Regions:
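Residue-level signal for inorganic ion chemistry
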Residues: 50, 90, 98, 137, ...
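A short, N-terminal amphipathic alpha-helix
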Residues: 86-97, 130-133
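Glycine-rich anion-binding loops of enzyme active sites
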Residues: 66, 101-172
Length: 173
């Protein structure tokens, strides 16, 4: 019974985002994201990421925006699933062009109804996607939102120029 109470107590803890400050929040959300690519020279924790792809590779960049009430409903979507979906959705754009996703940034706008623990759940889904597909989280931003949750994911990938597949190259079957 004691163990069940401890789990319930941990679940019920609510840390206000404003109580941490920007840098402590970033550190808490990104502490378990390892760097997996040599091309990631500097990731989270500086003013900008530093990325250097080897010669011969082109950089592919895609951005996806997800808005609560438009692209997802939190009544039916756990935050961990949403984080995974947001990340993998951007990876798929890179894969569609025959590239390999390498780096990811995640920016979120959150209303006061979200706690730090909620953002940790969102980032747990992103972390799982990054781990599964070998992608580095290299930056992002957080901001207050008056109307729910907004997630913007930017994914960078690499491909050899001669191997890139464009939509314009699609042929009817």
């Amino acid at each position: 019974m004691r163990c069940l109470f401890q789990v319930f107590y941990i679940y019920m803890q609510r840390t206000e985002i404003s109580s941490l400050g920007e840098f402590a929040l970033i550190k808490r959300l990104t502490r378990d994201f390892p760097i997996q690519h040599e091309s990631t020279r500097r990731g989270v924790g500086d003013d900008a990421a530093v990325i250097a792809y080897p010669e011969g590779l082109q950089t592919l960049v895609t951005t996806d925006l997800l808005l609560e009430g438009i692209h997802f409903d939190l009544t039916y979507t756990p935050l961990r699933h949403l984080g995974y979906k947001a990340a993998v959705g951007s990876f798929s754009d890179i894969y569609a062009m025959n590239g390999h996703p390498q780096q990811l940034t995640c920016s979120v706008g959150v209303s006061a109804r979200f706690a730090v623990e909620d953002l940790e759940e969102l980032y747990a889904g992103i972390r799982l996607a990054c781990s599964r597909y070998g992608v580095d989280l290299v930056g992002g931003d957080t901001s207050a939102s008056l109307t729910g949750l907004c997630i913007s994911i930017t994914c960078l990938g690499a491909a050899r120029e001669e191997e890139i597949v464009y939509r314009s190259g699609a042929q009817p079957t």
